[in-house]
């Protein structure tokens, strides 16, 4: 009985994670377009020493590029909510998820809702936290409507008319007058807290935690929590955590490849070829490139990569490195406010990982002999 309950909980949590990651996967192209074009807009504006007034320079090349960037970053949050709902309820959940996520991003709407319920503080919008809540609720409610038995002549209207309208009607008052304003207050507090964490002890701690999470399971649920957290903050204009996460995610494959090159006797012969591809994967921000090493020797590899990524993430936050793009690795380094420091943090973390892994791993032959004697 206990095992059945445990399996049910595990299955539910897996489903929640998959639904969330569906939303994130559809959101990433919007973040990428938004972040890159906004950065290009600032870069072009800087050529005429007009970087601070890019949005007031109507009709200039920088202004047009920045408008594309703003469009991408504005739509990314509703898209997140829309595709979480889509993952749960398929097509009937898509429009309600988008509309509910969009409406709670409008600060004036939430401020008016706050006036109605006597709670102030919704002017900033509910951010990606609100979109996640709206997406899950829209998906759950739409799926409930979808599972109802209805007369045959009504069935064709259910997915395109009745379910989307009913779901939106049911959840709009909930999101505006119950959940929206408190989530907006929490989102504003989080954004302000992170915006003030530039170079201080709290920033270093946050960078270290995010870095360690990126390396802890190399693409697993812990890694994804850190990644989603940082991607969501891009729409709020907070891009330092994204830099820390990207840098930290690049460290494990590069650091372990470096260790393999320095001390090949500590690894199986076939791992040497894996190291070559690991460098490319690492610089492409594919943390999973370190998994073959972790699978072969988790007790030594995981502490090594966690330490290196934590150091890299902490250094990035301490130095105030920013990254407006959610993916791309070495190919988006020019978009950083400090590209050389971005690369330096990658190298620092990789060296820490390489030194620790090389120091604590025994020679491969000795390790195999010890395992044979244990058997």
Curated annotation (Swiss-Prot):
Signal sequence residues: none
Domain text: The EIIC type-2 domain forms the PTS system translocation channel and contains the specific substrate-binding site.
Pfam families: PTS_EIIC (PF02378)
Regulation: induction: Expression is highly up-regulated in presence of fructose.
Miscellaneous information on this protein: PTS-type transport systems are very rare in archaea.
Transmembrane segment boundaries: 24-44, 68-88, 93-113, 122-142, 160-180, 203-223, 238-258, 279-299, 301-321, 340-360
One Gene Ontology biological process: phosphoenolpyruvate-dependent sugar phosphotransferase system
Biological role: The phosphoenolpyruvate-dependent sugar phosphotransferase system (sugar PTS), a major carbohydrate active transport system, catalyzes the phosphorylation of incoming sugar substrates concomitantly with their translocation across the cell membrane. The enzyme II PtfABC PTS system is involved in fructose transport.
NCBIfam families listed in its UniProt record: PTS_IIC_fructo
One GO CC term on file: plasma membrane
Single Gene Ontology MF annotation: protein-phosphocysteine-sugar phosphotransferase activity
Name this polypeptide is given: PTS system fructose-specific EIIC component
Phenotype on disruption: Cells lacking this gene are unable to grow on fructose. Growth on glucose is unaffected.
UniProt keyword terms in alphabetical order: Cell membrane, Membrane, Phosphotransferase system, Sugar transport, Transmembrane, Transmembrane helix, Transport
Subcellular location(s) of the protein: Cell membrane
Domain PTS EIIC type-2: start-end pairs: 16-370
Disulfide feature: none
Major localization listed first in the record, in broad terms: membrane
Bilayer topology: Multi-pass membrane protein
Organism: Haloferax volcanii (strain ATCC 29605 / DSM 3757 / JCM 8879 / NBRC 14742 / NCIMB 2012 / VKM B-1768 / DS2)
């Amino acid at each position: 009985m206990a095992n059945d309950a445990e399996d049910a909980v595990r299955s539910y949590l897996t489903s929640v994670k998959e639904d969330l990651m569906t939303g994130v996967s559809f959101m990433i192209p919007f973040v990428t377009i938004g972040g890159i074009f906004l950065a290009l807009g600032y870069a072009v504006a800087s050529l005429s020493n007009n970087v601070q007034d890019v949005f007031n320079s109507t009709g200039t090349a920088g202004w047009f590029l920045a408008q594309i960037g703003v469009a991408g970053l504005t739509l990314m949050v509703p898209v997140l909510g829309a595709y979480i709902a889509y993952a749960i309820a398929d097509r009937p959940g898509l429009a309600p998820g988008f509309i509910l996520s969009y409406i709670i991003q409008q600060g004036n709407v939430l401020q008016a809702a706050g006036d109605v319920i006597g709670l102030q503080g919704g002017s900033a919008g509910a951010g990606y936290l609100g979109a996640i809540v709206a997406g899950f609720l829209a998906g759950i409610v739409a799926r409930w409507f979808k599972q109802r038995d209805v007369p045959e002549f009504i069935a064709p209207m259910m997915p395109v008319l009745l379910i989307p309208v009913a779901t939106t009607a049911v959840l709009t008052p909930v999101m505006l007058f119950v959940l929206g304003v408190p989530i907006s207050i929490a989102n504003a507090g989080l954004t302000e807290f992170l915006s003030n964490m530039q170079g201080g002890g709290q920033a270093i701690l946050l960078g270290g935690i995010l870095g360690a999470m990126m390396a802890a399971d190399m693409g697993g649920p812990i890694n994804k929590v850190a990644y989603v957290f940082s991607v969501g903050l891009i729409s709020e204009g907070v891009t330092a955590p994204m830099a820390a996460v990207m840098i930290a995610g690049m460290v494990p494959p590069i650091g372990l490849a470096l260790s393999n090159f320095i001390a090949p006797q500590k690894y199986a012969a076939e791992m040497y070829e894996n190291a070559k591809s690991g460098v490319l994967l690492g610089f492409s921000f594919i943390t999973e490139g370190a998994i073959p090493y972790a699978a072969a020797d988790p007790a030594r590899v995981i502490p090594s990569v966690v330490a290196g990524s934590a150091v890299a993430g902490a250094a990035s936050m301490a130095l105030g490195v920013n990254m407006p793009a959610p993916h791309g690795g070495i190919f988006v380094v020019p978009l950083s406010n400090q590209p050389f420091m971005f690369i330096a943090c990658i190298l620092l973390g990789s060296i820490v990982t390489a030194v620790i892994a090389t120091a604590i791993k025994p020679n491969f032959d000795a390790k195999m002999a010890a395992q044979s004697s244990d058997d």
